[in-house]
């Protein structure tokens, strides 16, 4: 196995995307813009209701950190993804898709069980609401992870969705220890307002004594710090991380590195589907930092890539699109 720049740990999920009405979300008690966990029976029931009454848009490999890793690799970075899938059709499809995107995986990720699924419900305002059955990924342990690539990586990336799993949190703890012992920087994302609201203790455990780079959106930042303004939230987040990146949807992003803080405006697009936008942002930002492009260029690239994800259905762009976007940003920032 060759060395990689990015070692990511996250859930492995197959997305089923639907266009839905606001009334459908209300009727099924789904809070718009958040992720809700479900068991297999509830997932199957919702899927049948969706197929019967809403508009099906297709299936795609998902998982927050996986989407981030795909963006990182598609831009030219080398990456490894640690996850857990079932020994079923969806599991093999999932790992094959990562390998096709140039991402290294291990057969240790495959075990008996059912691969997780996520119903991605896109409302008329393009916001995504997720109903997730984690399946076997809820039982991710260090036994499914080959930590060797982490010892020589430059970045460890951890998704906040893992906060709901005790075994996954233990695996993250081990990954953090290996990263620190080998001088690997740690990036973390809060992932979702629901994680902040319902799994705060798990997030705190994984962030532990701090990280090098923290990603969150505006709502997550305010909720996690229990503040009313971004300025106040940023002051508290600086206690946890050197780099802070707060995304603000169409308004762009706020970037902080020690004493330097600046904002980069968003890109105007016709929003279709917000699913995966934050993930793509993180992947592009990490790639740019990793190759030494600087914070402002990293933010410009991340905003451009994520804006293109928002302008289409599905959490990932075609691999061929990333190189063109990188070229555009480098030309603009020259």
Stretches with model-predicted labels:
Residues 155-232, 251-253:
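Conserved beta-alpha-beta core of the PfkB/ribokinase-like small-molecule kinase fold
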Residues 42-117, 134, 328-332:
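Substrate-binding N-lobe of the ribokinase-like
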Residues 1-13, 19, 27-37, 53, ...:
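Conserved phosphate-binding/catalytic region of the ribokinase-like
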Residues 117-121, 252-255:
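Short beta-strand scaffold segments in enzyme catalytic cores
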Residues 108-110, 120-166:
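Conserved phosphate-binding/catalytic loop of the ribokinase/pfkB sugar-kinase fold
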Residues 79, 105, 186-187, 244:
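Hydrophobic beta-strand scaffold residues
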Residues 149-151, 207-208, 238:
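A short, aliphatic-rich alpha-helical micro-motif
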Residues 100-102, 135-142, 193-198, 226-227:
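Short gly/ser/thr-rich secondary-structure transition/capping motifs
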